[in-house]
Amino acid sequence: LLEDSGKSVNDFRNEIYKKFNIEEEKLTPVIENYAPEPTQPYLVEKEDKPSQIDVSPKLSEMKEEFIGERLLSGFSPKSTRELESTIDDLIEIIGNIPILKVTPNNARDFKKIISSLPKYRNQSPRYRGLTIKQILSLDGVEGQEPKNINKLIYRVRVFFKWLKNNYSEYVPQNHFDGLSIQEKKFDKPRDIFTNKELHKIFDTTPFLNNTIRNPHRRNKLASYFVPIIAIHTGMRLEEICQLRLEDVYKEGTVDIIRVTISKETKLKTVTSQRIVPIHENLKRVGFLEYCNYMKKQKKERVFWDLTKSRDGYGRNIGRYFMEYLRKVGVYEFQSKVFHSLRHTFITTLLQNGVREEVVNGLCGHKQKTMSTTIYFKGGFPPDLLYEEGISKLNFEGINFGKLKIDWKKLIG
C-alpha cells in the first residue's frame, strides 16, 4: 500500500499525529533486556598468582630442616656433617634454587663437577678456602675415584629421597637415582691381620716403645689399651675411645663391656648396641684394675684424657696406630688399618667354630635368621656370649701377659 500511495512511513505518521492531535515527540527505541540487574561488584583487588616454582622452598631451607631431623633421629654427628657438607657443594654447583626447579640436568652437572674435584680438598692447603669454580680453574687438579664419587652422589640421593617423602608436591621424583658410576671389581684381599702380622703388632718391645715408653706420645694409656681391647672385643675405634666407666661392670659372674647409645656416646647403627664379655687377656694386662681405679677417681670416661674432635674421640689413636703399623711393616693402604683388628676378631671366632649368630651378637651385626631376631631381641645372655664366644678367642703364640705395665706410674 505504501508503494502504491507514493508516501513514506513518516508521511503517514505525521498525518495521523495531525488528525488525532497527538503531540509529536522523539521516542527512544528500547531493546528488551531480560537479564537481571547487575549487582555492585565485590572490591577484590586482582593479584598476580605466583608460580609453583616461586613458592617452593629453596635448597638451603630444606637442608636445615633435613639436617635437624637427622640429628633428632640419633644419626651420628660425623655422618650428618658429611651429608651437610655435600649438600653445600650441591648448592654451590647448581645454585640455591627452589626445590621444584631442580632438573635432571642439575643432577648430571653435579656428578660431572664433583668428579673433577680433588678428594681431600678441604684438608689440603692448596685448595683450602677456594670455591669450587676457583679449584677447577687450577692446573694439575686430580679428580676422584669412582668409589668416592658414588659416596657423594649417595649423600645427595639420601637428601632428595627425604624431599620426595616429605615434599612430594615439589619433588615427585629423585633425579639422583641411577647416577652412580659403575666400579670395577677387584679381588681385594680381606683386611685381616695374619697371625704373623699380629706377632709383629703385639711384640712386647716395639709395642711398648710406641705407646707408654714413647716420650712424645700423648694419651699414652689410651694408645696402649685401645688396640688390645679392639682385638679382644671386636669393638670399633670410636666405640672404645668414647667408652664410659659405668659401661664396664660385672653382670652375674661375667665381667662385661656394654656398648650403648647415650647422650655422650654415638654408635654406627642402633643394632650396634650390645654387651661384650671381657677376655682373660684384658684382665691380664690390668684393664679391669685400671677401670676400677678410674671409677674411684670419679672419672666418667675410661680414657678421660682423650679430647673430642670433629670426628669423635678416636682421631689421634687411629693416627698413632697407623704410624705404628708402618713402623713394623704391616700397613697396607685401605687394607691393613685399625679396623682390621675388628675383622680379625670376627674371622678368628668363625674359624674357631663359633656360631655366626653368636658372632653377630658380639659385634652388633643384624641377625640374619628370623628366629634369632624374634627370640633374642634382648640379645644373648653374658654367660653364653662368654662360653660360646669370647672364651674360644685365642691368638696362637702371642703372650699378651708380657705387655702388662704399671699404669699407675703413668697417672702419677
Predicted regions and their residues:
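C-terminal secondary-structure termini that scaffold catalytic or DNA-interacting sites
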Residues: E280, Q297, K368-T369, F380-G412
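Short, charged phosphate-coordinating catalytic segments
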Residues: K161-N174, A222, A230-T253, E356-G361
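Conserved tyrosine-mediated DNA breakage-rejoining catalytic core shared by Y-recombinases
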Residues: Q242-V285
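N-terminal helical hairpins
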Residues: L1-S60, E64-L72
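Short, polar N-cap/turn motifs at the start of nucleic acid-interacting alpha helices
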Residues: V248-T253, S335, V354-F376, G397-L410
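Basic, Lys/Arg- and aromatic-enriched nucleic-acid-binding interface segment
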Residues: D139-Y154, N174-L237
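Active-site/catalytic core of tyrosine-dependent DNA strand-transfer enzymes
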Residues: L198, D203-P206, S262, H279-F333
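Short, basic (Lys/Arg/His-rich) helix/loop patches that form interaction surfaces
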Residues: N209-H216, T233, K296-R301, S309-R310, ...
